[in-house]
Amino acid sequence: MIQTSVFTDDFSGLNPLEVPLVEDGREAIYFKENRGEIGQWQVVNSLRQQGFNEAWQVKEGIDGTSLIQTFTNLDQNNEPLSLTTHPIVVAGDSMWQDCKIEVDFTPMAKFDKCGVVFGYQHPNEFYFFGTEGNTVILKHISQPVTPLRPFERILEYKDLVWTPGEEMHAVVNIRRNGVTTILNDSIVLYNEVTVLPGRIGLISDMPAQFNRVEVSMLKGEIRKLSRKKRQLARREEIHLKNYPKMVRWKSFETGAFGTDQNIRLGDLTQDGNKEILFARSSNKGKSVCCITAMNLDGKIIWQYGDTLAAKQEWGGEIPFQVHDLDGDGKREVIFISQNRIHILEGLTGKGLNRVKLPRSMEISSLQFGDFLGTGRDNCVLISDNKSRLLLLNEKLQVLWEQEIEEGSLPLIYDLDGDGYDEVMAGYSVFDHEGSLLFNSGEFIGDQCNGVTLTELVEGELSTPCLLYAAGDWGMMYVDFEGHVLKQNLVGHVKYLSVADFDTEVPGLEVISSNAWGSDGLVHMSDASGTAKQVLTSSSYVSRCVPVNWKGDGEEFFVTSADSVSGGLFDKNGELSVEFPNDGHPVNCYHVSDLTGDARDELLFWNQEKLWIYTQDDNPRMGATYSPDRYPLYNHSMKQMNLSLPGW
C-alpha cells in the first residue's frame, strides 16, 4: 500500500551550534518560549544529574548533519538512571496513530536502550522499539508503581549480535490491531496491542547518533486525521464560548523599574485598591537595590533605592512583603537586604526601622503569623528554605530559632485551632514556641518541595492532613500527628494546589505538576487522593495556581502566560479560556482579584512591561464565589496553594 510522507527530518536544517535551552530549575516561575526546542524536536524531560540536560546536540560530519545524544545515562555510582528516566526528544502530532515510522540511528554502546519512541503520551507512558543490550526489543513503558521505577512490559524480543558503531535501520508499522517492527530489514517482531494516538520520538541511554526520521501514513488515515482535528477544533470552540473571555484591562511600560519574579500586591494607600510593588535585586544576589510602588493607573507612588542599578535577569526570589505589622491599620513594606530587616512606610516609602539580624544567613523567605495568640499576624518568620528558621516579634526581637534537617518554603497555619500558629518547614512541624511536634521525613525518601493543607476523604471519614510535594515519592498525605495516611505515586511532584476544581463531586481536588524525569506531567486527583485525570502541559512544569475566573464556585488552573501553550484549564484538562495572541509578556504571572468583584484577574509581565487581564463580563452581578486563600503578605512563587470555598 502506498503511503504519503507526513514528517521527514534528516537534520540538515539544524545549526551545529544549536543546543536546547538548558533547564535551570525555575521553569515554573520563568516561562521561556523556546525551552527544550531543537529544530522540529522537543526535549521532554530533565534530571538532577550533570550532563543530562545538555544531552541532545547537533553534529556536522562528513556524511552530513546528525542529531546526537551525548550523555551516558548512569549516576555517579555507575547505576542506571534509566530506572528513573531517559534522554528523549519527541516530534510530530499527538493524534498520530496508524502510521509507519522509519529511523536510521547508530548506538555507540549496548548497555541500555537506543531507538524509536511511538505512541508517546508523556515521559512515563510510551512504546519503545530498538536495541537494549544484546537484544532487539519492543516494550511498553508506563506510570511508576514504586518511586523511581517506571513499569516496563516486554511485548516481544529477539537476540541480536551487533557491534557498537553499526548503523541501524528501524521500521515501526502501527495498525489498529497490532504493531509490526523490523530492524535492519531482517529481524521482525509483532505484537497484538492497541497503541493510543501519540507523538513519535528518539531515545537513547548511551551516546548515539540519529541520521534520519520519516513518518508516513495512508491517504485515508490522513483524511481521517484531518476530519478528527476539525471536529475537535469545533468542540473546543463551543466549549470556550461557555466561559467569560479574557480581555486586557490595564497595560504599563515598566522598563525603568521592571523586575523578574519579584512583584507583590497590597493596599499601600488605604483606598481599598491593591497597589503593585516591584523589587529589584543587584547582580550580586538577593540584596535589594530598588523598590517601586505603582497604582493600578500606572502612576508611580514612590521609589526606594537606586533605580538605575543593573537588572538581574531571571533572579531568585527577594524576601519582601506588604503587611500591617504593627496593627495601626497602615501597611508597611518589609524586606531583608544585606542581613538587615528594613521597614518602609507603605504610603510614602519612607524608612521606619532597620535592624541587623542576630546572625548571618542567606534569607530566602519572609512571612508573618500569629505565634503569640494576639489575633494578629504580628510575628516575622525568616527562613533560608533549607535548614534554618528564625522568628521575630513586631519589634524585631528574636523569639526563637530552629535548625532543621531539610526544609522548604515554610507554611504558617493554626493546625489545632488553639489561636497559635504552627510552622511546617520541610517534613518538620513546630509549635508556636519553636518546639518540634513531629518530623515525618524519616518515612519519605526524597526532599520536600512544599506543603499545603487538604482533607483526605475515605468513605464517610474525612481527615484534615498535610499534603506534601515529596519529589520522587509523589504526593504524601500526613495527618496532624505525623502519621502517613496515603502515598500517591505520580512522578516527581514539584508543585501542587488544593481547590474546588469540580463542584459535581464532594470535597476538594488536588492538582500536581511534575519535574525531573516527568516534566510537565499534571495529575488531577479527587478528595480520596485518587488520580482522575492526567495531562501533559506543553508549558512544562506548572505552579498549578487556581483561578477563580467564573465566580460560580468552580475554579480553573493556569499553566503559563503563553498564548500558545498556556491558558486556563478545567477539571478535565480542557482549555477553557484562551489567552489573547496580542503580544503580551509571558515570562511571569500572578493571580489575584484587582477589580473588586471577587473574581481573579491575571497579571502577565516581563522586565519591560506588565499587562493585566480580566473577564469580558466584569463586573459580575449577584452572589460571587470568593475563595479563602493564603494571605498575600505571605505570597511566594514557590508556595503550594490552598483555595477554600467561600462566598
Predicted stretch roles:
Residues W96-Q97, A109, W162, I174, ...:
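Beta-strand-rich recognition domains
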Residues M1-Q50, E54-A55, E60-G61, T65, ...:
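Beta-propeller-forming repeat regions
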Residues V117, I137, T180-I182, T292:
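Beta-strand signatures of extracellular beta-sandwich domains
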Residues F71-P144:
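Secretory/extracellular carbohydrate-interaction modules
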Residues Q97-C99, D104, Y157-V171:
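Trp-centered recognition loops
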